Swiss-Prot record:
Belongs to the universal ribosomal protein uL6 family. Coiled coil: none annotated. The keyword Ribonucleoprotein applies. NCBIfam families: L6_bact. GO terms for cellular component: cytosolic large ribosomal subunit. GO terms for molecular function: rRNA binding; structural constituent of ribosome. Part of the 50S ribosomal subunit. Keywords: Ribonucleoprotein, Ribosomal protein, RNA-binding, rRNA-binding. This is Large ribosomal subunit protein uL6. GO terms for biological process: cytoplasmic translation. It comes from the Bacteria. InterPro entries: Ribosomal_uL6-like, Ribosomal_uL6-like_a/b-dom_sf, Ribosomal_uL6_a/b-dom, Ribosomal_uL6_bac-type, Ribosomal_uL6_CS. This protein binds to the 23S rRNA, and is important in its secondary structure. It is located near the subunit interface in the base of the L7/L12 stalk, and near the tRNA binding site of the peptidyltransferase center.
Length: 177
């Protein structure tokens, strides 16, 4: 029994939800998203709630039950409030700048790294050492933040690199003589 899947999903105020077969659509103030639910899972719209249940008691259906509920809840949160990831840049001379829609990253390489931001995601740089990635699709926002972080992951000795704002870097001690 999925503890997450059992809970009904309430449709937030300001968001309209429709269920067409296995396709769940949500439209809100930030935009419009849809999610195609797996065939193993049954979706029902009842007034201002959406309930998700497995079609049968197979292991495959039960394993996709909770995930489907979470994905539907994420599209509701996305079209209502949106999602945001903050990245911090640590290191001497490491900085970021916007070049039109692209990000120019100076990360200690012999060249600057240019990252092309995909559509559906907005990037702002409040400070040269801070990047804010925001959008309505949680998966896409997280993917863009992970791709930017991958250019220079934080290293454990000095902590230089790009890290998530809430990430804690495990620091190591250097060599001893």
């Amino acid at each position: 029994m999925s503890r997450i899947g059992k809970k009904p999903i309430s449709v937030p105020s300001g968001v309209t939800a429709t269920v067409e077969g296995q396709l769940v659509k949500a439209k809100g103030p930030k935009g419009e998203l849809s999610y195609l639910v797996n065939d193993e899972v049954l979706v029902k719209l009842e007034e201002s709630f959406i309930s998700v249940s497995p079609r049968d008691q197979s292991k495959d259906a039960r394993s996709k039950w909770g995930m489907s509920r979470s994905m539907i809840e994420n599209i509701f949160c996305g079209v209502k409030d949106g999602f945001e990831k903050r990245l911090e840049i640590n290191g001497v001379g490491y900085r970021a700048a916007l070049q039109g829609k692209d990000i120019q990253l100076s990360l200690g390489f012999s060249h600057d790294v240019i990252y092309k931001v995909p559509s559906g995601v907005t990037v702002s740089i409040p400070k040269p050492t801070e990047i804010v990635v925001s959008g309505i699709d949680k998966q896409q926002v997280g993917q863009v933040a992970a791709e930017i972080r991958e250019y220079r992951r934080p290293e454990p000795y000095k902590g230089k690199g790009i890290k998530h704002a809430d990430e804690r870097i495990f620091r190591k001690e250097g060599k001893k003589k």
